[in-house]
Amino acid sequence: MNTHPQTSPNTHYKIADISLADWGRKEIDIAEHEMPGLMSIRRKYASKQPLKGVRVTGSLHMTIQTAVLIETLKDIGANVRWASCNIFSTQDHAAAAIATSGTPVFAWKGETLEEYWDCTLQALTFTLADGTLTGPELIVDDGGDATLLIHKGYELENGSTWVDEPSDSLEEQVIKRLLKRIAIERPGYWTRVVNDWKGVSEETTTGVHRLYQIAATGRLLVPAINVNDSVTKSKFDNLYGCRESLADGLKRAMDVMLAGKLAVVCGYGDVGKGSAHSLRAYGARVIVTEIDPICALQAAMEGFEVRTVEDTLGQADIYVTTTGNKDVIRIEHMTAMKDQVIVCNIGHFDNEIQVDALNTLTGVQKINIKPQVDKFILPNGNTLFLLAEGRLVNLGCATGHPSFVMSNSFANQTLAQIDLWQNKDVYEKNVYRLPKKLDEEVARLHLEKIGVKLTTLTANQAAYLGISVEGPFKPEHYRY
């Protein structure tokens, strides 16, 4: 952990080490060649400037790939401020390169929870020409933390007592303390923010779930675009990205041979599918746990055993949570696991594993092995290794998904930002998805890079199917 992040005199950035900028720039240059979707969008929209002067806050992993996204948003006119959406996911050389280029960025690997939420606040804080503090007009969110902070702050200014209610977690306590401080230091701030805020595009399953929950209660403050459920995001980033990055995280963290190990993957959605296939590709024997009969049947038809966590205790060598739910691996599970077990998470939040309960377990001994690898000696004498403190193992212990697959996701994010701004007076306060035509276009932008040549329908074939020669080729209800 870097406990003394570097800042600029004008609060332009707060990062680990500005001297890493040259290294970061070299890797950004490499990534650009692997991100044809984003680079094509730059070329298409650079002269049109569809986001000219628009204040955009990003709360998304500050990686090399995200740096390419940030510079794409800037190239099409946006005024950008950025923070990471995870305390461990920042690549410090990427943050340094972005800071050097003039973008305000507040992120470093190994933030405390207090630092993390303060960075989110700084990314949300813009200063107008007259010195007035205001917020973004658009948000690029990943997990929904920036969206959550604005909603909770606005509700506090409108009579909510949530900040005085008992907290379910340490992180919730941190959020409440921050909101109380802002209420004193910046009275009426969140109302000003909401008055200017026009929309949010959400990157991940967990954040989308939050949006639908808020929308169902009628409390959603702005239109939102669900980027996660674009086919070129969920079926690529979530599936193929995890298929490569999970094993990378495990290998870098533990230097362990996966072949022959018994691994349990909790959840068989798109992330779970990618994770299960990642482990099996290395020769691990994989068991899947599921609550959904459809996903369970899919796993079984792929040749995976489907059991419960309880059935695997004392047998499995590795546990990976992928669900987006809470309390998937509980303290009673961890104390019953075999000696030398590895436990990690590749879902968005750390509450999939009862990390707080493990840290406070009577008689437990915690030993830090290296950054993001902790050894717990349990009261029964067994050892458990927890990776990335229960947060995203692929970003905490490795570098996340490869650039090519992230080009799909970030092309969707950029198109969503353009769509939100162009239709800010049209969209209602609800959750939307990008049209299938744009989904197909994102895929099309990536084909040449990998040597794909599409077959073209004849006019007669298109008429027979009842579609256009140019697409869309599938109905909205089609399951890819």
Curated annotation (Swiss-Prot):
What does it catalyze? Answer: S-adenosyl-L-homocysteine + H2O = L-homocysteine + adenosine
Q: What is its EC number?
A: 3.13.2.1
How are cofactors bound according to the entry's free-text note? Answer: Binds 1 NAD(+) per subunit.
* Binding residues for NAD(+): 204-206, 238, 267-272, 290, 325, 346-348, 394
Record-given protein name: Adenosylhomocysteinase
Choose one Gene Ontology CC annotation of this protein and give it.
Answer: cytosol
Family assignment?
A: Belongs to the adenosylhomocysteinase family.
Q: Which UniProt keywords apply?
A: Cytoplasm, Hydrolase, NAD, One-carbon metabolism
Can you tell me where the transmembrane regions are?
none
> So what does this one do?
May play a key role in the regulation of the intracellular concentration of adenosylhomocysteine.
Q: What is its main location?
A: cytoplasm
Q: Name one GO biological process term.
A: one-carbon metabolic process
Pathway, per record: Amino-acid biosynthesis; L-homocysteine biosynthesis; L-homocysteine from S-adenosyl-L-homocysteine: step 1/1
Record-linked HAMAP family:
AdoHcyase
> Which SMART domains does this entry report, sorted A to Z?
AdoHcyase, AdoHcyase_NAD
List, alphabetically, the PANTHER family matched.
ADENOSYLHOMOCYSTEINASE
- InterPro entries per UniProt: Adenosylhomocyst_ase-like_sf, Adenosylhomocysteinase-like, Ado_hCys_hydrolase_NAD-bd, NAD(P)-bd_dom_sf, S-Ado-L-homoCys_hydrolase_CS
Key word Lipoprotein present: no
Report the GO molecular function annotations. adenosylhomocysteinase activity
Coiled coil spans: none
Q: Which cofactor does it need?
A: NAD(+)
In terms of NCBIfam families, this protein maps to: ahcY, PRK05476.2-3
